[in-house]
Curated annotation (Swiss-Prot):
Keyword Kinase: yes
Gene: TMK
Gene3D superfamilies linked: P-loop containing nucleotide triphosphate hydrolases
Documented EC number(s): 2.7.4.9
Protein name per its UniProtKB record: Thymidylate kinase
Domain of life of the source: Viruses
PROSITE patterns named among the record's database cross-references: THYMIDYLATE_KINASE
GO aspect biological process, one term: dUDP biosynthetic process
InterPro entries per the UniProt record, alphabetical: P-loop_NTPase, Thymidylate_kin-like_dom, Thymidylate_kin_CS, Thymidylate_kinase
Length: 204
């Protein structure tokens, strides 16, 4: 039995990640494809993260980074098991979000990546570019919904993309929605059909 693919959607806030994940779940109906999003706010760490994001509580940046990281590690075994059982996972945000946001706040990218080192490695990361309209929508109730901060996050994403150690697929914001939806579906299908070998370890 071939293993499943780990396919991650990344991008700035309000770039359409969840929408595109749901499009995939609807357009490729299968009992071998599941959706997972981070942070998982139902866990102990997830509830602490939710309190922070919604400004109910404050923590120093180091604690925040570790909370997000721990939230992903809580699901590392689940992800590994699902992939080995032939289940493809469509993941809305992953370690790259954690590193980009931490680095945008001034943390060391190398140190931030070390916290995530060893997580299941994605077979594909789809990065959704944000047009000016999407970026300017980044004003909201949650703590990171700030235009200037999101621009800093974007620069950190670009650094990771340029490293070239992960298979990134950048989707332009210029595409019409129906074109974007079809393009992403085809990219995902190809990734599912071409996945080979054991599950890798991220940043090892």
């Amino acid at each position: 039995m071939s293993r499943g693919a780990l396919i991650v959607f990344e991008g700035l806030d309000k770039s359409g990640k969840t929408t595109q994940c749901m499009n995939i779940m609807e357009s490729i109906p299968s009992n071998t494809i599941k959706y997972l999003n981070f942070p998982q706010r139902s866990t102990v760490t997830g509830k602490m993260i939710d309190d922070y994001l919604t400004r109910k509580k404050t923590y120093n940046d180091h604690i925040v980074n570790l909370l997000f990281c721990a939230n992903r590690w809580e699901f590392a075994s689940f992800i590994q098991e699902q992939l080995e059982q032939g289940i493809t996972l469509i993941v809305d945000r992953y370690a790259f979000s954690g590193v980009a946001y931490a680095a945008a706040k001034g943390a060391s990218m190398t140190l931030s990546k070390s916290y995530e080192s060893g997580l299941p490695k994605p077979d594909l990361v789809i990065f959704l570019e944000s047009g000016s309209k999407e970026i300017n929508r980044n004003v909201g109730e949650e703590i990171y919904e700030d235009v200037a901060f999101q621009q800093k996050v974007l620069q950190e994403y670009k650094k990771m993309i340029e490293e070239g150690d992960i298979h990134w697929q950048i989707i332009s914001s210029e595409f019409e929605e129906d074109v974007k939806k079809e393009l992403i579906k085809n990219i995902v299908i190809e990734a599912i059909h071409t996945v080979t070998g054991p599950v890798g370890q991220l940043w090892m």
